[in-house]
């Protein structure tokens, strides 16, 4: 599986914890019918919705967030915004992030889904909010909405 490849390509001293939320029937179907999921065990998955507080707790405990997007999806998922907004580095399979104004290759790594090679320097850097990311803040979004409403005559 992709996560097995990620774990294999990381040095032993980098601790990983994967939290994967999928429906239970999908796990069983992929694990036993398609023989996917590699060495990942049932304990690596959660089959219940993860609360906002739990997501925030896991994000706070993390140095880097891994985003594995659906290859048929267009655009970004919420995870890049959550990661970067919380001052975390990001590793993603979604190359469309490179087109965003806030893209910074020092704190955002785009990896190949088939051969995920990760530059471990990403685990050593400390980040704050990055240039261009302010555009996606709640405050800026609110200003845009009210400007649209006021200009809607």
Give the residues covered by each predicted segment:
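Nucleotide-sugar donor-binding catalytic core of glycosyltransferases
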Residues: 1-77, 92-103, 140-152
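Conserved donor-binding/catalytic loop of nucleotide-activated donor transferases
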Residues: 60-62, 84-87
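Short, structured coil segments at secondary-structure junctions
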Residues: 86, 104-106
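Conserved acidic donor-binding segment of nucleotide-sugar-dependent glycosyltransferases
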Residues: 108-115
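A charged, aromatic-enriched C-terminal amphipathic alpha-helix characteristic of glycosyltransferases
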Residues: 115-153
């Amino acid at each position: 599986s992709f996560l097995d490849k990620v774990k294999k390509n990381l040095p032993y001293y980098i601790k990983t914890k994967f939290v994967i939320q999928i429906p239970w029937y999908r796990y069983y179907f992929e694990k036993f019918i398609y023989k996917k999921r590699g060495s990942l065990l049932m304990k690596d998955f959660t089959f219940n919705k993860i609360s906002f507080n739990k997501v925030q707790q896991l994000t706070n405990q993390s140095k880097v967030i891994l985003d594995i997007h659906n290859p048929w999806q267009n655009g970004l998922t919420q995870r890049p915004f959550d990661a970067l907004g919380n001052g975390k580095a990001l590793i993603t399979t979604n190359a469309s992030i490179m087109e965003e104004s806030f893209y910074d290759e020092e704190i955002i790594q785009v990896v190949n889904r088939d051969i995920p090679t990760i530059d471990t320097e990403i685990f050593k850097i400390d980040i704050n909010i990055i240039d261009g990311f302010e555009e996606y803040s709640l405050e800026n979004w609110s200003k845009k909405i009210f400007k649209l409403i006021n200009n809607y005559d």
